[in-house]
Amino acid sequence: MAEPSVESSSPGGSATSDDHEFDPSADMLVHDFDDERTLEEEEMMEGETNFSSEIEDLAREGDMPIHELLSLYGYGSTVRLPEEDEEEEEEEEEGEDDEDADNDDNSGCSGENKEENIKDSSGQEDETQSSNDDPSQSVASQDAQEIIRPRRCKYFDTNSEVEEESEEDEDYIPSEDWKKEIMVGSMFQAEIPVGICRYKENEKVYENDDQLLWDPEYLPEDKVIIFLKDASRRTGDEKGVEAIPEGSHIKDNEQALYELVKCNFDTEEALRRLRFNVKAAREELSVWTEEECRNFEQGLKAYGKDFHLIQANKVRTRSVGECVAFYYMWKKSERYDFFAQQTRFGKKKYNLHPGVTDYMDRLLDESESAASSRAPSPPPTASNSSNSQSEKEDGTVSTANQNGVSSNGPGEILNKEEVKVEGLHINGPTGGNKKPLHADMDTNGYETDNLTTDPKLAHMTARNENDFDEKSERPAKRRRVNSNGKESPGSSEFFQEAVSHGKFEELENTDD
C-alpha cells in the first residue's frame, strides 16, 4: 500500500516530510487558527500496521501446549482444561449407565443399552479426535468463553452487592451492642495483687469496734415516719430562731434516729431523751461569739480553707465540722463582703454599669490606677548648687520671661571645659580675650559707666564684689571690668533682666 504524497502547504509554511519548526503567521494568531494537519501527517508517517508479525504469533501459539498458552495469557492452573471436563462428563455418564443397567436386568433390555453405550462412547471419541485435530479452534473458543464469563459474573456480582446494600439500608435494624452494659458482679471485679493490701485477712483496720448508727430492719417505715414527726413537733417554749415554724416535709433527723437506736428502738424513751437535748436533736448551730468570728477570719487569711489548721490554731472551742458549717453561713453574710473587700478573698466581683460596654478597658484602667497608687512617689531632687548660685548672681526673681521660657535655665550653664575652649560669646568673632572691645563699652556697645548708675545693678555689683573670692573657681559666668576697675554685669544678663521687667527706658538712658 503506497503512501499518498502530501505536497500541500499550510498557511504557516510547507508541510513536508522534513522536520522544521512551525512558524504561525499573524492571521493565525489573530483568528486563533488551529492547524490539525500536523497530527494527520504524523499518523501517515507511522505507516500501516505490520500484520505479518501477528500471523506469526498466532501460528506459534497454535503449536504451543495448552498449559503454556494459559500461563502466557495470565491464566494459571485454576482454569480447568477441556479434556478434564470431558473426562468428568464421561465418568458421570458411565455411572448413570451402570445404575440404569442394574435397574433393567429383569427387563431384558441390557443388549440395547450396551449398544447405546458403545455408540455414545464412539461419538465422544470422535469428538475428542476432532478437538485434538483442531487445537487452535478449541483454545480460541475456550479463551473467549473464559474471558467473557468472569466479566459477566463480576458485573452481576456488583449489581447484586448494590442491591443487597440497598436492602440492608432500607431494612436496617440496629444491633444491641450500643446499649451500655452494667458491669456488676464477680466477673467485673478487679484482681488486687497481694502486695498492695496492707492488712491481713483477720486484722482490724483500727482498734475501736464499729458502732451501729441505724438499722432499718427493726421498725417499719411508717412507724419511723411517725417518730420523726413527733421528734420535730414544737413544744411552744422555743425562742428566737427556734420559734420559726418548719415546713410540712419530714426532716431526716439523724440525731433522733441515733437516739432511737441507742434506746433499742423504743420510741417513747427516745422522745423523752430528745426533749432534754433539743439543740442536739434539731442540730441547731450555736451562736458564735465575736472573738470566735475574728479568729476564724484570721485563720482564713493565714491558712486558707484548711479548716483543720484553723480549728487547731485559731478556733479551738469549735470542731472542724462546726467550722465548715459556719464557713458556709458566714460566706452568705455581710461580714464576708467586708472581709473580701479588705483581703481580696475569693473571686473579684465587678459591678455592671449600664453606661459601660467595654469592661476590659475598665479592668485595665482600674489595674493601672491601683498600680499607680501603690507606686511610691519619687523624692524631690535637690536643686543644683550651681543653679542657685547663678540665680543669685543674676538677681532675677521671676523664672520665666514674656515668651514663657526660663530666663536662666540649667541648660545655659557651661562647664569648665566648655568655658575654656569656647571663650567669650560676642556679636563679633569669638576670642579668648576676657576684656571688652573698648574700655568704656561692653560687648553689645553699651557704656558701662551709665549702667552702674542703676540702683539694681549697683546692688548686684556690690554683691558680686563681696563674693568674688568665693566664685573665682566657677568660670561659668563671665566677669567684665570697666575702666574704673569695677565689675559690671554681662550684656546678656542685663538684657534678660531688662526684658523680664519690661524696662526698655533704661536701655535708652544708657544709650544717651
From Swiss-Prot:
Residues 1-16 have a biased composition (Low complexity). Residues 17-36, 414-423, 462-475 have a biased composition (Basic and acidic residues). Residues 1-63, 75-173, 366-512 are annotated as: Disordered. The keyword Ubl conjugation applies. Residues 129-144, 396-409, 482-494 have a biased composition (Polar residues). Keywords: Cytoplasm, Isopeptide bond, Nucleus, Phosphoprotein, Repressor, Transcription, Transcription regulation, Ubl conjugation. SMART domains: ELM2, SANT. Residues 180-278 form the ELM2 domain. Residues 37-46, 83-105, 160-173 have a biased composition (Acidic residues). One of its GO terms (biological process) is regulation of DNA-templated transcription. GO terms for cellular component: cytoplasm; nucleoplasm; nucleus; protein-containing complex; transcription repressor complex. Residues 283-335 form the SANT domain. The modification Phosphoserine is found at residues 10, 141, 160, 166, 367, 369, 377, 483, 488, 491. The modification Phosphothreonine is found at residue 448. One of its GO terms (molecular function) is transcription corepressor activity. The modification Phosphotyrosine is found at residue 155. Changing residue 214 to A: Loss of transcriptional repression and HDAC1 recruitment activity. Disulfide bonds: none annotated. Residues 180-284 are annotated as: Interaction with HDAC1. Interacts with HDAC1. Part of a complex containing at least CDYL, MIER1, MIER2, HDAC1 and HDAC2. This is Mesoderm induction early response protein 1. It comes from Homo sapiens.
